[in-house]
Amino acid sequence: MSVKEYLSQAYRLDQRINSKLEQIKSLRDLAAKATFALSDVCVSGSKNKQQMENVIVKMIDLENEIDDDIDKLIDLKREIVSMIKQIKNPEYQTLLELRYLCFRTWEQIAVEMNYGIDNIFKLHQKALRSINISQTVQ
């Protein structure tokens, strides 16, 4: 795994968490519809109740997955912070933190650091080369 791939893991994990949060929202909307259907029907609604139970079980499973993913993300960010702290150059540290911990775009980083975008790309390559991933990642 390259340094860039390793550092990018946090962003990918954050995306998966956000995707699961959207899925939960969708399931909540579905559960609300099922609840509405239950209150509308005065006859035996065992099918609707079962549908509602299935939605709730799926929501709980997703929430547990999100909790696990958040724990992983926190641990991964700690590892990335530790890796970045080993770099002597503060500009490299700032750039890597903005990109891989704050998930800023290249344009945002260029503005925040008062550099042109081409200089940010060059600085990024130098920053990546300054990291020895073999010492940090097993």
Question: Which residues does each PLM region occupy?
Answer:
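DNA major-groove recognition helices of helix-turn-helix
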Residues: 120-131
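Short alpha-helical "recognition helix" segments of helix-turn-helix
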Residues: 108-111
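N-terminal positioning helix adjacent to the helix-turn-helix/winged-helix DNA-binding module
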Residues: 76-79, 90-92, 123
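N-terminal interaction/assembly modules
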Residues: 1-86, 133-138
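Short amphipathic alpha helix immediately N-terminal
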Residues: 88-102
